[in-house]
């Protein structure tokens, strides 16, 4: 053995042998990480037809065919996706992940079955060793089609939009704490093709800034959960509406709470409610009278009005008007 180490040719090839050994070790760790990721995804309920890892050594890319996720109240599938984690560092440092959804999303919920097609859908994630730091989900030209099975007449739903963005973040790197997650939703130029009673042009812009329980990201809702809406901005034709408030999931399955609505253009709001068949002509006249009364007695005007929206005892109330059942979360 001493003769081997003293041989000149050994030291000539020693760097290459060392590099080969390190490459084999790195590939082994890369393969282990690939298997570990697949194991963790399977533990969450994700299945697939096939998974092909590639990208060694700089990154870890998984080409997934026919991924499918099955949970208690959710079934999701997609023809193909590509997930890339870079740099490849075994979770020792923060890593950036990118998921490219190559096909339409098929979603089954208790309320109905839906298909979401698009012209491009990327999700980016910043991952720490203890979980998700932040995530962005961007979709171009989304089209939602489906059927609401809980309704007796099984109405068809057909929505189209220009862009959809969903952004999630947490301020600290402690995933085991019950701290809520900050969520931002951006939707541009939504059009309601079905049902036609809602009007083709739904709104030009919808921005939501909210704080949600962390378990909501895992589709785990429970009674007592609190949703804090820091700001909701909606623009539709001549109507601009800004809302703030707090909502709570009631044990009976309804949403409870209150929102403060700041309305620009009361007439446009009444037009929207009447088009959606939520108010009658008589209700419209009552609201027009109250708007004029508020302008005369308070600081509001008919162009700018503050209106409370309450969800209480399973009903939805806009000021004095009963708009029907409160939203159900179950």
Predicted regions and their residues:
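N-terminal type II signal-anchor transmembrane helix
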Residues: 2-41
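Extended terminal
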Residues: 2-15, 52, 219-226, 232-234, ...
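N-terminal beta-strand/beta-hairpin edge segment
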Residues: 46-174, 232
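Flexible, membrane-facing loop/turn or short amphipathic-helix motifs
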Residues: 66-76, 103-116, 143-159, 170, ...
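Low-complexity, intrinsically disordered segments exposed to solvent
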Residues: 80-84, 91, 130, 207-214, ...
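Extended amphipathic, helix-rich lipid-handling scaffolds
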Residues: 102, 119-147, 164-169, 185, ...
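Gly/Pro-enriched, hydrophobic low-complexity segments
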Residues: 176-184, 191
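Short helix-loop boundary/capping segments
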Residues: 197-218, 237, 244-247, 251-253
């Amino acid at each position: 053995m001493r003769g081997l180490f003293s041989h000149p040719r050994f030291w000539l090839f020693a760097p290459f042998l060392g590099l080969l050994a390190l490459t084999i070790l790195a590939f082994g760790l890369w393969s282990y990480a690939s298997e570990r990721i697949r194991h963790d995804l399977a533990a969450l309920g994700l299945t697939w037809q096939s998974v092909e890892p590639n990208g060694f050594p700089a990154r870890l890319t998984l080409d997934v065919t026919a991924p499918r996720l099955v949970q208690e109240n959710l079934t999701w599938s997609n023809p193909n996706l590509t997930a890339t984690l870079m740099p490849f560092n075994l979770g020792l440092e923060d890593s950036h992940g990118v998921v490219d959804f190559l096909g339409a999303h098929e979603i089954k919920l208790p309320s109905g079955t839906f298909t979401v097609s698009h012209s491009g859908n990327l999700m980016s994630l910043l991952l720490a060793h203890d979980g998700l730091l932040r995530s962005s989900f961007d979709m171009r030209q989304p089209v939602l089609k489906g059927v609401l099975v809980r309704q007796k007449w099984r109405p068809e739903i057909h929505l189209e939009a220009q862009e959809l963005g969903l952004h999630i973040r947490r301020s600290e790197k402690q995933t085991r704490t019950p701290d809520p997650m900050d969520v931002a939703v951006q939707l541009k130029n939504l059009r309601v093709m079905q049902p036609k009673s809602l009007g083709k042009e739904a709104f030009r812009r919808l921005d939501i800034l909210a704080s949600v329980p962390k378990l909501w990201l895992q589709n785990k809702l429970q009674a007592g959960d609190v949703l804090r809406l820091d700001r909701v901005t909606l623009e539709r034709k001549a109507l601009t509406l800004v809302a703030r408030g707090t909502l709570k999931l009631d044990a009976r399955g309804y949403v409870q709470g209150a929102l403060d609505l700041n309305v620009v253009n009361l007439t446009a709001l009444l037009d929207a409610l009447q088009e959606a068949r939520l108010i009658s002509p008589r209700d419209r006249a009552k609201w027009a009278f109250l708007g004029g009364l508020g302008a005369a007695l308070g600081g509001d005007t008919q162009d700018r009005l503050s209106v409370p929206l309450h969800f209480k005892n399973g009903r939805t109330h806009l000021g004095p008007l009963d708009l029907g059942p409160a939203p159900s979360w179950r």
